[in-house]
Amino acid sequence: MNEQAEVEQFLNEMTYGCLGTTGEDGWPHVTPVNYVYHQGKIYFHGSRNGQKMKHLKACKQVTFLIAKEYSLIPSYYTDPEMACPATAYFKSVLIKGTAELVEDPVEKAGALQAFMSKLQPEGGYRPITAEDPEYRPRIKGVAVLAIKIMEMSAKFKFGQNLHEEVRESIIISLNSRKRELDEETARLMRKYCPAHKDSGNDSTEA
């Protein structure tokens, strides 16, 4: 799996991110929103008259952050006295782009259907199409926005900079602690370590 595919897999896995906009007062605003990554864009929806829409009318440039914390790593895993080694392992993706109101009903329906497929994969609803007469007024009424991605950077931090013996010691401690996501963190530490990358596995930025 290459780096771009790994980042896109993370975008498809997560269900919400933080939208950064600039308010009319010049202050930055951050709003958590559900999203879907669909056909190379970030889509989200909401009211046509909400605060987000006011901000976007004033400035279409936005940032969008998706992040997931995996495990907190206590300092004593690697140093018996100093607090400095305490850290956290995580994945994050930062997107810069422009947000546009989607007017085309076919594109809107496609984005909304992608939302449902992601957030309600078990089904239990009629598929959303622009041609469906019952969906048509609802599609028209909701504001769907698309972020056209201009720049995307990812950071997956899992101890890639550590010496092998230190990394293995943390992995052993995580597998023994067994908190939620500890075992997954240990697996990702092995996956992303430079030795595994050199042997043919891809990694993301340290």
Locate the predicted segments by residue.
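A generic structural signal for short beta-strands and their flanking turns/coil linkers
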Residues: 15, 31, 38-40, 58-62, ...
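An N-terminal domain-cap segment
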Residues: 1-43, 47
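Catalytic micro-motifs at enzyme active sites that drive phosphoryl/nucleotidyl and oxygen chemistry
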Residues: 21-25, 52-53, 81-84, 133-134
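Short, structured beta-strand-loop surface elements
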Residues: 49-111
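A general structural signal for short secondary-structure junctions and capping/turn motifs
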Residues: 9, 52-56, 135-142
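Short hydrophobic-aromatic micro-motifs
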Residues: 42-45, 64-66, 95, 145-146, ...
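C-terminal edge-of-domain segments
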Residues: 103-206
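A structural signal for short, well-ordered beta-strand segments
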Residues: 35, 97-99, 147-149
